[in-house]
Amino acid sequence: MGQATSNIDPQEKRDIVQEFTKEELQTLFYHRCLSLLKPIEVAFLKQDLNGKTSVTADDLGKLFKFPENTNSFSEGTLNILYHVMKLIGKFPFINNNNLAIEETLSFEELVVSLVFFSGRYKKIFNSDYDFLKLLFISLSDRPQTKDSKTIDEKNVDPGTEKFKTNLIVALEEEDKQELRARKINWSKLDVIKDFDHTEVQQLSVNAKRLQDMTTLCLILNAIVRHNHDAIQKQLVEYSDRWREFEVYSLYLLRYLDVYLELDKLENQKISYDSFSKGINGLLPYFFQINLNRMVCDSLLSSNSPMATKPTEEHNDSTESTPQKKHTFPKFQETKVVSIPFLSYVSSMLQGIGNPTILSPSNLVKLYAGSEAGFSIRSLETKIFKWQAPTLVVVSGKRLKSKTMQTNRRYQKFDEMYPRHFLASENHLRDWQHESDRITYAVLVNQPWKSSNKNNFGDEKSIILSISPRADYFKSVHSSILQGQSIYFNNLGMGLGFGNNQPLNKNDTKRFIPGDMSLTIEANLEFAVFRHLVNSSSSNDKFFHNSQQSHISHEDYEDRFTISTIEVWGLLVSGKELEEQKKQWEWEEKQAEARQNVNIRNLGEERAFLEMAGLVGNHGAAGGSM
């Protein structure tokens, strides 16, 4: 007849639990990591070690092929990297207080840390394992004592303490270490889930230490990966420019804490909350990606996809083709747009989920005020021919109170730009300084056009704060506005990003700035970035406000005199690229034709060309030099 129902919990029936000592778990985890390296990688790693069973901080520099005889990879940076790898190498028992005593990194610790740096740990744990928390713990300042407090309280011998461990499949007596390690469900181990009982909220990271780590990752991010020799050459070259990358790493860290100051970093601390919110908000994959590159460029390069000879062969065949193919001008750095700048901006774009890639190979300089003149007409002739996305970069010094009170050109602009702050108010927040250099960049997805009546653009436009701190302002999704946030007004009102069309009729000129907007006046001399979150204006809102924790609810402005303005074209692929090449080639032919005209004897015609911004007199108007 009927059968008796079972009272055994199905989950309980499935779970297989076994106890291991700390030493046993560490050994098994090492073997699990070792199984994730290819035999050839292990062989090359041992070869690089020359029979050594442990390495020092200096040895690490050689293993990672860091350049020697340079001040860039200082002893401090290598020591930071060593300390991080030492702690991660102790995994899963990372709440270890004896690290300061140990001066070498064992082979086992090296293997474990390489697995985490390379991202292969994802094959061991669930996809939600928090690598950033582990990195923060490894970088943090912690009191160094000889014994763990937890063990002292329990009066347990650390060598005999047992840890309950879930198994996927029961262990067999004849199982080798690698197989035993594979049978453990590491994600369910309590010591892994709570990071070995680490009270992360009580920890902090020294700001200078985090800056060094960030600078190293920016350099690694800048390297274009073609082949091993090219990688090494770039690593040496960019390492010599450590100070340039270091400046941008400070800007990035100011997204974590806006109060960080260059000359106080050694004594400033970053809490876990600031680190977690800031990094996850701006650079969620930055450290993992670039530590992976560091490992794959050197020790585990056999697993790194490299561009090979076929690329060169393709170039050779192209040269032998009778038809001459147009090539764009080779990238040359400017005062603002440099290799460190591109690495910095690319890291930001990648972090906020923007697919745009910025590199020396896909950028063409269309306009630079220092070369073509600070003229709206000159700007128009240079950028309107580009039928692909562009990057606008505008930079200068923050306007000082004295300049605002005495400069007549600024006062004329100020009359047209409606004030939000009262004249009697201190217009600077406590994290803004009069000596700041201000730089903003705008990614414009659509081609430029004259827009004296209606805005243009789409929701892929984005405003980036470059200096003195990193920030971003994405387009608002709206079926009504449709991202049409940009105007190029050649009738005396300049450029606007996030503004409504300016009023310009019956001798009345007035800007209508949005609450999140960047306005550049017609002489390309002054600019204002406005960030208002407590405004009651009825103006359209084209861009989201800052998500930075200190700033997201603050009203502020950056008013600055422009010393540099540049527009760079982005090279796209496919049909658009071919059309752009044809357009560029036609423009070059027209330019050559103009050069053949004897403009010295043109008289009135020369004056006309000057007004059009095509020849001469570019420096006569606009731009604060």
From Swiss-Prot:
It comes from the Eukaryota. The keyword Cytoplasm applies. PROSITE patterns: TLDC. GO terms for cellular component: cytoplasm. SMART domains: TLDc. Keywords: Cytoplasm. Residues 335-571 form the TLDc domain. It is found in: Cytoplasm. Residues 305-327 are annotated as: Disordered. May be involved in a process influencing telomere capping. Belongs to the RTC5 family. This is Restriction of telomere capping protein 5. It comes from Candida tropicalis (strain ATCC MYA-3404 / T1) (Yeast). The lineage of its organism: Eukaryota, Fungi, Dikarya, Ascomycota, Saccharomycotina. The gene is RTC5.
